[in-house]
């Protein structure tokens, strides 16, 4: 196996959204989602929709949830996202109806090809079917 050469890493092909949108989401995520003092799920659901997420009815989002890009997220009706969940959705994540993503779960859409010296980014969507 060849050594990794981080200086040769290139993910210029990966475009998860505009820089301004990502920056705005960063602050909204910190203030309303990662903040343990905001227990109000309804506000979080509205903010997710505002940023392009498709969110069904009766969705409950607990405190300290980290979502990378809401515009790449779909949550079905009556699903729950538990405390300390990290949705690192570099590409589309689809969560079905009546699904519970329990406390501390991590949904990771990306990794790196450690077998290549260029450490290429690998991304694949996640689909969690109806509960």
What are these regions (language model features)?
Residues 38-45, 65-75, 80-131:
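Flexible, glycine/small-residue-enriched loop-and-beta-strand segment within the central core
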Residues 1-53:
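Terminal amphipathic alpha-helical/low-complexity segments used for targeting or macromolecular assembly
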Residues 56-58:
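N-terminal signal-anchor transmembrane helix
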């Amino acid at each position: 196996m060849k050594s990794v050469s981080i200086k040769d890493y290139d993910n210029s092909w990966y475009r998860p959204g505009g820089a301004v949108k990502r920056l705005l989401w960063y602050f909204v995520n910190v203030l309303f989602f990662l903040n343990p003092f905001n227990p109000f799920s309804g506000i979080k659901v509205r903010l997710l929709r505002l940023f392009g997420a498709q969110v069904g009815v009766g969705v409950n989002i607990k405190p300290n949830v980290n979502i990378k890009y809401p515009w790449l997220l779909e949550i079905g009706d009556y699903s729950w996202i538990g405390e300390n969940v990290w949705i690192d959705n570099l590409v589309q994540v689809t969560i079905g109806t009546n699904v519970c993503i329990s406390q501390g779960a991590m949904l990771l859409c990306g990794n790196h090809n450690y077998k290549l010296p260029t450490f290429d980014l690998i991304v694949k969507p996640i689909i969690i079917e109806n509960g």
